[in-house]
Curated annotation (Swiss-Prot):
Pfam families: Cut8. It is found in: Cytoplasm; Nucleus. Binds the proteasome. It comes from Pyricularia oryzae (strain 70-15 / ATCC MYA-4617 / FGSC 8958) (Rice blast fungus). The keyword Transport applies. The gene is STS1. This is Tethering factor for nuclear proteasome STS1. Gene3D superfamilies: Tethering factor for nuclear proteasome Cut8/Sts1 (1.20.58.1590).
Length: 313
């Protein structure tokens, strides 16, 4: 029985069977890499050519032009601004400039007077002490004649005396309403007057004598005004009567007006040697101290402020 079998291909092809071989490829690596790169470039070009519809639009940026360089001003001299100029002035220079402006423009001077705070007792006495230090610094060393010394210290001496004359009315009523402030200033100013130079010549002593006279009248005015407030009780409780008696003794009795004002109001220190006449007149029933209705006796007896009887009962 003849059976026809289909011929089966051999698992190992013959080397001469060229029809079944794969196409021949280039063995050059350079050619292979070039073809691959070209394909990649073609794919990228296709992707970039197709823009998605949902892609956001890139905003266009405006490039700012570089600003022109500002040309620096050439160096030249110019005066200082007013705030810088005032920083360079000390107290004396600033006071001099302000004083000249006020003298040239009286309306500005009046505004300064109205706007400036009132001087305190401490500031006024501090200025007097500054003038006093200048006077001491002008006194020559060693033994010198009286005339030479006087003319050497005349200018600071006059400046101190004038300062006392200018400051004293500022602390007197009705400008100064506080009696204690007035008394404190007069106490300090009197101490300054005590230390003024003593001269042998009467012509040179007139400055100190005039200063004592002015201070004495100022004491009298303040004492009289204080006696109208509470019977002048502040004069005794503050020890001002004894203080005035010591000043009068140190001045050589040149505060007579002040002592008379203190005695006439019934307030004077009992330990002072300058009140012996006043004490004697009080014990004899004469003067203000001997009056039973005086404020001093009423305060001592405890009857000050009691109601006064009116009528026959």
């Amino acid at each position: 029985m003849n059976v026809l079998l289909t011929p089966q291909p051999t698992p190992f092809p013959h080397q001469y069977e060229t029809s079944r071989l794969s196409p021949q490829r280039s063995l050059s690596p350079y050619t292979n890499m070039t073809s691959r790169k070209r394909k990649a470039d073609d794919n990228e070009g296709d992707e970039m050519s197709v823009s998605p519809l949902s892609s956001p639009a890139i905003p266009s940026r405006h490039l700012s032009r570089p600003s022109k360089k500002i040309r620096a001003a050439e160096a030249s001299g110019r005066p200082l601004p007013l705030p810088r100029l005032l920083e360079t002035l000390d107290t004396t220079q600033l006071r001099t400039v302000l004083q000249k402006i006020c003298e040239r423009h009286p309306d500005i001077g009046q505004e300064v007077v109205n706007g400036a705070p009132r001087p305190s007792v401490g500031s006024a006495l501090g200025i007097l002490r500054d003038y006093q230090q200048r006077l001491r610094g002008a006194i020559p060393y060693g033994q010198t004649s009286s005339d030479y010394t006087y003319y050497r210290v005349k200018q600071p001496l006059m400046a101190l005396v004038d300062a006392i004359s200018d400051f004293t009315p500022q602390f007197l009523p009705p400008i100064e309403t506080q009696v204690t402030a007035s008394l404190q200033y007069l106490d300090g100013a009197t101490k300054v007057v005590h230390e003024l130079p003593d001269w042998d010549s009467q012509a040179y002593r007139q400055h100190k004598d005039n200063a004592y006279d002015e201070i004495s009248r100022a004491w009298a005015l303040v004492i009289t005004e204080a006696s109208k407030r509470g019977g002048g009780f502040v004069l005794h409780t503050g020890g001002w009567d004894q203080m005035l008696a010591k000043h009068n003794q140190q001045s050589g009795g040149r505060l007579g007006s002040a002592m008379q004002a203190m005695a006439s109001n019934g307030w004077i220190g009992n330990n002072s040697p300058n009140n012996q006449n006043a004490s004697a007149s009080s014990s004899s029933g004469s003067g203000a101290g001997g009056d039973p209705n005086s404020i001093l006796n009423q305060l001592v007896n405890g009857t000050y402020g009691n109601p006064v009887r009116v009528g026959p009962w």
